[in-house]
Amino acid sequence: MTELIYKIIKPETEVRATLVCVHGMQEHHARYISFARELSKQGIAVLIYDLPGHGEAFKDELGYFADRNGDEVLIQSVDTMVKKLHAEYTHVPHFLFGHSMGSIIVRLYLERNDNFAGVILCGAPNYQPAAGFGQKLAQLLVKMKGPKAKTKLLTALSVGSFSKAVKNAKTPVDWLSYNEENVKQFLNDELCGVPFTDAGNRDLFTMVSHLHHPFTAKNPSLPILFISGEDDPCTGGTLGLVDSISTLQKNGYANIENITFPKMR
């Protein structure tokens, strides 16, 4: 079993809090080093890591998590890293951060463990009714072609609509950011933008379909902050954010805030 690559960025001063950072799809932990360093200046010890199927350790199997139940593999990775960081710093507040697909994983993880001082969900994708169909189609293709095959149709179903959301786009990933340098860095990184395998897309669709899964919050006063760009196609716009927030409220979370940044993706 491949060991997950992780790094803890520690403050030079006393640690005031911890944060586990869960990155998005088709990227890796090194893209969050500058973010972690900024937080460390505020006394926060930040653990960044590569999700299964992402980063240098998985460069020969990018976008593949497991033959079966890859969604569980992703969610379990959060638990592993949370326990690792919390064991090192036992007497400070603990926070959890998830970006894009990472925010999906974090939301599903809350059913198992919501014992945090706060959770930040960045660019959080909304529930998609068609995810159930995508999951069944992907599973059929896995049976036909194997878990590590890649089908363009599944890639189009999972992320194709994002690129279509940007008019006069110069690249297929302009939807990531208005900042052209950010887009260029993503395109020039061999560990970024590699399409998921059919099994990987199956697991992604499974997680999205589970976003509406009801559960009872153990920590209903948990502060949850949604942050996103106004033009981020992942969130589903205002209606998508409302749905994401109301879903958590239905599960018992009563302390949710949202910040939407204008003219940003």
Kindly label every feature range from the protein language model.
Residues 29-62:
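Conserved alpha/beta-hydrolase
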Residues 23-27, 100, 230-231:
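Active-site glycine-rich loops that stabilize anionic/oxyanionic intermediates
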Residues 226-228:
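Short beta-strand/loop motif that positions the catalytic acidic residue
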Residues 15-24:
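Short beta-strand element of the alpha/beta-hydrolase
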Residues 106-191:
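Alpha/beta-hydrolase-fold enzymes
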Residues 1-10:
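A short loop-to-beta-strand scaffold at the N-terminal edge of the catalytic core in hydrolase folds
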Residues 67-86:
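Alpha/beta-hydrolase active-site loop
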Residues 89-100:
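Alpha/beta-hydrolase fold nucleophile elbow
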